[in-house]
């Protein structure tokens, strides 16, 4: 919202099926919002493939196409292309993407690298948004990945794995955010105080991983 207040056009979107974004708040602030609905983009991609194939293929060939479209990787392709189209909007506005939890993000990252290599190898017919995706993500003047985690063992270890994969892919990450920190509250509950004390180990770990570039957000009762 601060970016929008400075006069920039902002597009907020999510790849997370859980979709925790507050759309009303964003719209009221003048921010464009969207989400990548896996079912919708899958059906749209299938229809695009069918339409293009029908121009040159026989009915028998179309049966093979339909069989191929039932492959699990078809959904990955559809989501990846939708992701690339969203990132391509950065030509005209600032795009903020809330990705799904770490495992889903890693799959998306792997798909991005794989597609980039395939496009380079085959020089095939692919959308411009796909061809430009990885170079844009690697451009530190255009892209910053902010890793968001919790002050707990598993989330921090998963986030560390994501950081390493980002580094391997040549994608910049400087800032981390640690959400729901009980250690920043004045709780008097003995159980929560013990939990808050345990958080300090993981907050310190994040500060090491981020080289001091970590923002801590206090736990709030929503």
Residue ranges and their predicted role:
Residues 1-5:
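Conserved small/polar residues in nucleotide/adenosyl-binding loops
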Residues 7-96, 102-132:
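Nucleotide-state-sensitive switch-loop elements of NTP-binding domains
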Residues 11, 32, 96, 144-146, ...:
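A structural signal for isolated positions on well-ordered beta-strands in alpha/beta enzyme cores
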Residues 13-15, 100, 148-149, 179:
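Generic beta-strand/beta-sheet core signal
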Residues 116-130, 140-158:
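Conserved Switch II/interswitch segment of TRAFAC-class P-loop GTPases
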Residues 133-137:
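A structured binding-face within diverse protein domains that lines the active/interaction site
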Residues 138-142, 150-222:
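C-terminal lobe/tail of nucleotide-utilizing enzymes
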């Amino acid at each position: 919202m601060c970016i929008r207040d400075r006069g920039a056009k902002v597009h907020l979107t999510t790849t997370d099926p859980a979709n925790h974004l507050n759309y009303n708040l964003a719209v009221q602030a003048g921010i464009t919002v969207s989400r990548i609905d896996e079912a919708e983009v899958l059906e749209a991609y299938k229809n695009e493939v069918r339409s293009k194939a029908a121009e040159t293929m026989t009915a028998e060939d179309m049966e093979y196409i339909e069989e191929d479209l039932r492959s699990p990787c078809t959904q990955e392709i559809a989501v990846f292309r939708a992701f690339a189209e969203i990132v391509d909007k950065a030509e005209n506005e600032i795009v903020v993407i809330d990705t799904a939890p770490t495992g889903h993000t890693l799959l998306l990252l792997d798909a991005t690298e794989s597609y980039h290599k395939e496009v380079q190898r085959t020089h095939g017919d692919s959308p411009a948004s796909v061809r430009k995706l990885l170079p844009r993500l690697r451009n530190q003047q255009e892209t910053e990945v902010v890793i968001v985690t919790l002050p707990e063992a598993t989330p921090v270890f998963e986030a560390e794995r994501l950081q390493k994969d980002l580094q391997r892919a040549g994608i910049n990450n400087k800032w981390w955010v640690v959400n729901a920190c009980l250690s920043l509250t004045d709780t008097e509950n003995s159980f929560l105080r013990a939990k808050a004390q345990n958080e300090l180990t993981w907050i310190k770990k994040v500060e090491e991983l981020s080289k001091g570039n970590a923002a801590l957000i206090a736990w709030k009762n929503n």
